[in-house]
Structures are given as structure tokens and as C-alpha cells.
């Protein structure tokens, strides 16, 4: 079958296969589109944490992005782990060269196990330059707190943080509410014109490794197929909820 669309994924590799590039490829493929990759780092990790991170040279990242796009033009781009200033800068330059407009940024900063995946200088450039370049920013609550220098304890706090990001140049923001203590999962979509809340029953499970990667890749895929950003977020959230609810337990712990 011919793939519906082509998605370029710029992110790190997860050796466990549950998150990162591996989760992205699986998601894009499962939704019927074609996945291409530009790997920014190689991580040795499992569901409990990150053992090590091997950086890919910035020149090789730019070559992956530009050489691939020159031959197979992406319909959308999903960006994940950008762990250093050099990586953020080279991705910015490459995005400008290839000129793709539909870009989803999942600002991966901290792994589920607590390991920090980006340095402070990179966060500064991401905030000042990269968020202005993308169509949608998809932080979870800890990431939104880092980006806005605020504390989030409620849905109202999520909305306030999203509006700060909009005022800083983001076009659209989806803050994921999974870290709030609640029986209802609430994700907040915000732009200059509207605030939309997606409500779903929270699934009581530990199988959440890679859910942020999966969500952003699903959004990119639906968006590339002509859906609006709002509809893409809605459909992607439903897809991830289904995936969480049916996820097998593979790990020992």
C-alpha cells in the first residue's frame, strides 16, 4: 500500500524501543504514513532510566535532514530530543533550508526515569528561537514548568503556562496533563484565539514510557494528512489512550 504521507522525525534513539525514534517510526507506520529519520543522539536506556547518551555530530544531523529531504520531501516534521546548543542551532539552520511548514516540537527535556536530556543553554535557544519556528509545541507539565519558569498544580496553571509560551512566540501549544493528580486526564490546547480542553478518563498503568513521543508523532501524521491542528491533537490523544490501554508488559520490573 502506498503511504498516505511522509514524516521526517528529528529525535534521539531509545535502545529499549519504547520511546524516541523507535516509538516515532512505529507510530507513523501504524497510522499509514512513511517515516524518515535524522538521529540526534543514541541513548542506552530501558523503562527504568537512561544509562548513557552518545551525541551525533551536528554536521551529520544536518546531512541527515537535508540529504533526506532533498530526495523525499516531508509533508510534516516531528522534532524530539535536541540535547545541545550545537544540535538546536543546526536543526534551526536545516529547517530554514528545507522550508517545511508543518512542524511539531516535543521539547524532550527529562526522561521518565528522571535523567536530564537537554542542557540549560539549549533550553534558552529553544525558547527564544525554535518555538517560534514550529506549528505546535507539546510539552508535558515538567517541561512546561521549565520553559515558563512557573509551577503547575492545576488546569488553570496549565492554561497560564500555555499563554506565556504563546506570548513568547509559540503559535499553538498543547500541554499534556498526565502529571496532575486526577482521575480525569486533561490536555490543554491553546493559541491566541482559543483555549480547548481535551478530557479523557486517566488509565491507571505504569505503561507510559514513550507516550509523549507517540503523541507528537501521531499529531504530525494526522496534520500531514490535512487535518486541522485541533483535530490532529484530538485524534492523536485518542490513539495514545488506546495504545496505553492495550500496551503489553514487557519489562521485568
In which residue ranges do the predicted regions lie?
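Conserved N-terminal subdomain of the carbohydrate kinase-like
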Residues: 2-9, 23, 27-112
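Glycine- and other small-residue-rich loops at beta-strand/loop junctions that grip anionic moieties
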Residues: 13, 79-80, 115, 208
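Conserved phosphate/ATP/ADP-binding segment of small-molecule kinases
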Residues: 120-194
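Phosphate-handling active-site elements
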Residues: 31-36, 195-196, 222-236
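Short pre-catalytic strand/loop immediately N-terminal to key active-site residues, enriched for Gly-Thr
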Residues: 10-16, 195-209
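Short glycine-enriched, charge-decorated loop/helix-capping segments at active-site entrances
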Residues: 49-56, 115-120, 149-153, 204
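Charged C-terminal helix
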Residues: 4, 55, 230-253
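Short, small-residue alpha-helix embedded
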Residues: 22-27, 146, 205-229
